[in-house]
Design a protein with these regions (language model features):
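Extracytoplasmic ligand-binding site segments that recognize negatively charged/polar headgroups
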Residues: 35, 78-223
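A ligand-binding cleft/hinge motif common to bilobed small-molecule-binding domains
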Residues: 88-91, 220, 225-243, 292
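Ligand-binding "clamshell"
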Residues: 93-100, 122-126, 237-248, 309-313
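Periplasmic-binding protein-like
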Residues: 134, 193-202, 240-264
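Conserved C-terminal helix/tail region of periplasmic/extracytoplasmic solute-binding proteins
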Residues: 320-351
Length: 351
C-alpha cells in the first residue's frame, strides 16, 4: 500500500535500537513492543523516546493490515502499540482485540485536530489515536493530460489508453468505481457492485497496468500519465517530477487514517500510553512528517514547523471545507466475501 516494508529500513531501526542499548552496560528498566508499517517512523524518534523515558522500544514492521491481523490473532507475539488503518481498527474493536485507552494518560490528545476526532470507525474515540492521515485521488502529468482533471471519469477516457494506472487492490479499485457511479465505497448492494465490476472490466482495455507501490516510479518517469494515488505518495512524486499534480475527484473519495491502538493483551499498558502521548508532541510529529514526506500530521500547529514545500502543499494540508465528500473504509464483515468474488471475476475477465 502506501508504506512498503524495506529491509534496509528495518536494519536501520535495529541499529538505532541496539546502539541506544549500549554504553556503560545499562539496561532499560522497561520495554514496549511496537508494531507499525514499514518506513513509517524516523528511527531517531525511537532513540529519543528511550533516552527520555528509559523505556526500550522493540520495533517491528508489517506490510498490510491483513498481516497485522494475522499476527495479532495467530501469533504468540504480544505488542503494546500497533498502528492499523480505519477499517481494521473497526474490526479489531468488534472482535475485542484492542482495549479502551485511558485518555487521562494521553494529555497530548488535546493537540489532535478536532475534525479527526470521533472517526466513523471509532465514533466515541475510545480506542484509537491518529498517527497519520490522507486522501486518495488522481495524480497526473499536466504536460501530457490537457483535459481538466476533476472527475474519476478521466480514468475511463479512451484518449488516455495505456496511460492509466489502477491500484492492484480490491477495496481501493472497487472504491474508485463505486464513487464514480455515485455510490458509497463501502457499498453492500450487490447491484451497485455489479455495476462497478462492469465498468472496471470495460476500463481494462485502457489500463497500462494494475500496480502497487511500483506504480509511483512509472508515473514519475513518464511511462504513464494518470494514476490513482495516495496523497502521501503523490506529494513525494510531485517533488520528483514538477509536471505532476494531484486532485481529489468531485464525486468524492477515500479519506484514510492510520491510528495507534493498544492490543487487549498488551504487556506494558503504561509504557504504551507514554509512547502514544510522546508521538503526539508537536516537535516529534514535525520530525516524523519530515522523515515520511507526504503524510499528514493529525496534530495542531505541526504545519508551521515544516519546510515550505510541505506546509504550503494542498496535497498534504488541503482546505477541508473545499474537499468533495470523503469517507473512510469500513469493515464489511462477512460481506467482504462478495468483494473477493467480484474482484476475482474482474481479474479473470477477458475483453
Amino acid at each position: 500500500m502506501k508504506q512498503m516494508k524495506k529491509i534496509i529500513f528495518a536494519f536501520a531501526i535495529l541499529m538505532v535500537l541496539s546502539l541506544t542499548g549500549c554504553g556503560k552496560g545499562k539496561t532499560p528498566k522497561e520495554e514496549i513492543y511496537v508494531y507499525n508499517w514499514g518506513e513509517y517512523i524516523d528511527p531517531q524518534i525511537l532513540k529519543d523516546f528511550q533516552k527520555g523515558t528509559g523505556i526500550k522500544v522493540n520495533y517491528d514492521t508489517y506490510a498490510s493490515n491483513e498481516d497485522l491481523y494475522i499476527k495479532m490473532t495467530q501469533s504468540q507475539d504480544k505488542y503494546d502499540v500497533v498502528v492499523p488503518s480505519d477499517y481494521m481498527i473497526e474490526r479489531l474493536i468488534k472482535e475485542g482485540l484492542v482495549r479502551e485507552i485511558d485518555f487521562s494518560k494521553i494529555p497530548n490528545f488535546a493537540n489532535v485536530e478536532d475534525i479527526l476526532k470521533n472517526p466513523s470507525f471509532d465514533p466515541e474515540n475510545k480506542y484509537s489515536v491518529p498517527y497519520f492521515w490522507g486522501t486518495v485521488g488522481i495524480i497526473y502529468n499536466k504536460a501530457e493530460v490537457k483535459d481538466k482533471v476533476d472527475s474519476w471519469n478521466i480514468l475511463w477516457n479512451e484518449k488516455y489508453k495505456n496511460q492509466i494506472i489502477m491500484y492492484n487492490s480490491q477495496r481501493d479499485t472497487l472504491g474508485v468505481a463505486l464513487k464514480r457511479l455515485g455510490y458509497s465505497l463501502n457499498s453492500t448492494n450487490e447491484k451497485e457492485l455489479q455495476e462497478a465490476k462492469k465498468s472496471l472490466i470495460e476500463q481494462k482495455a485502457l489500463v497500462y497496468a494494475y500496480l502497487d507501490d511500483d506504480g509511483r516510479d512509472v508515473v514519475v518517469q513518464g511511462d504513464a500519465n494518470l494514476s490513482v494515488m495516495y496523497s502521501g505518495d503523490a506529494l513525494l512524486m510531485m517533488q520528483q517530477n514538477e509536471d505532476l499534480d494531484y486532485v481529489v475527484p468531485k464525486e468524492g473519495s477515500n479519506i484514510w487514517y492510520d491510528s495507534m491502538v493498544i492490543p487487549k493483551n498488551a504487556q506494558n499498558v503504561e509504557g504504551a500510553e507514554k509512547f502514544i502521548n510522546y508521538m503526539l508532541e508537536k516537535e516529534v510529529q514535525a520530525k516524523n512528517v519530515k522523515h515520511c514526506v507526504g503524510y499528514t500530521s493529525p496534530v495542531k500547529g505541526v504545519k508551521e514547523l515544516l519546510p515550505d514545500e510541505i506546509k504550503n502543499s494542498k496535497v498534504a494540508y488541503p482546505d477541508m471545507d473545499k474537499l468533495p465528500p470523503l469517507e473512510s473504509f469500513k469493515d464489511l464483515g462477512d460481506f467482504i466475501k462478495v468483494y473477493d468474488r467480484i474482484w476475482t471475476e474482474i481479474n479473470a475477465s477477458n475483453l
